Regions:
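Intracellular juxtamembrane helix-capping segments at the cytosolic ends
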Residues: 45, 124-138, 146
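Residue-level signature of mid-helix packing/kink "hotspots" within the transmembrane helices
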Residues: 36, 64-72, 157-158
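C-terminal ends and interior cores of transmembrane alpha-helices
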Residues: 92-106
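Glycine-rich segments within core transmembrane alpha-helices of 12-TM secondary carriers
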Residues: 139-161
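Symmetry-related core transmembrane helices of the 12-TM Major Facilitator Superfamily/SLC fold
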Residues: 175-194
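Hydrophobic core of transmembrane alpha-helices in multi-pass small-molecule transporters
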Residues: 27-28, 97, 108-125
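Helix-to-loop junctions at the C-terminal end of transmembrane segments
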Residues: 69-83
Length: 215
């Protein structure tokens, strides 16, 4: 029992940067940001372009359609290049594509294309990418580590909603898209760049990574 406790402390001593960067990456990724902010953005978009609420929220449906198509590609890229490269690239492109909403001109077609781009480029920020590395770092405290990683969804869902409302009220919806979209690039990306690393080499299974790390 004491040995397991010591191993658990050792895991967190080594792996807490991965957990922290995963929490930020998930919390500022595709899972929460578009879905928690679309309701706040809908009213100013209706006022600006005369769109219906149903037309605006259809963007969420597009995201739900694109993600299942993009997920196998993300999985292949993660196997080929490693989850670190996939996560960092996806954070950067997701941030840019989300900020691109600020340039909406009233074309619903382009608005929907933007939603598709957000889903496509942001698929690598979904929890499966981050939790793969967390899963490989932890054994004894794996459940706790995964739980802490997923904590970011709720935390940044709340913070993102408040921040979006504040930006809309003080600077308008275009600035809100830029401000919220910049969060992954300015917060999650730098932390992940320095702290998010997978165990072992690219293309290894989780068991192989543990063996190579212990050798």
């Amino acid at each position: 029992m004491q040995d397991q406790t010591a191993r658990g402390y050792g895991e967190f001593a080594k792996g807490w940067p991965v957990v922290f960067s995963a929490m930020l990456g998930i919390g500022l990724g595709l899972s929460p940001l578009p879905f928690y902010t679309v309701g706040l953005m809908a009213k100013p978009l209706v006022k600006a372009f005369g769109w219906g609420y149903g037309q605006i929220f259809f963007g969420v449906t597009i995201t739900s359609m694109v993600v299942p198509l993009a997920s196998p590609v993300i999985g292949f890229l993660a196997e080929r290049f490693g989850v670190r490269r996939v996560a960092l690239t996806s954070l950067f492109l997701f941030s840019l594509s989300f900020m691109a909403f600020a340039f909406s001109s009233g074309s619903l077609a382009l608005f929907y294309v933007n939603w598709a781009a957000v889903a496509l480029f942001g698929a690598g920020t979904l929890p499966i990418t981050w939790t793969r590395a967390v899963n490989n770092y932890f054994d004894v405290r794996k459940g706790l580590a995964l739980g802490l990683s997923l904590l970011g969804t709720g935390v940044f869902g709340y913070v993102g909603t408040w921040f979006t409302a504040w930006l809309i009220e003080h600077y308008g919806w275009r600035a809100a898209y830029v401000g919220v979209g910049a969060l992954p690039m300015l917060i999650a990306l730098p932390v992940a760049f320095f702290a998010f690393h997978d165990v072992g080499g690219v293309g290894q299974t989780g068991a192989e990574r543990k063996v190579s790390d212990a050798a």
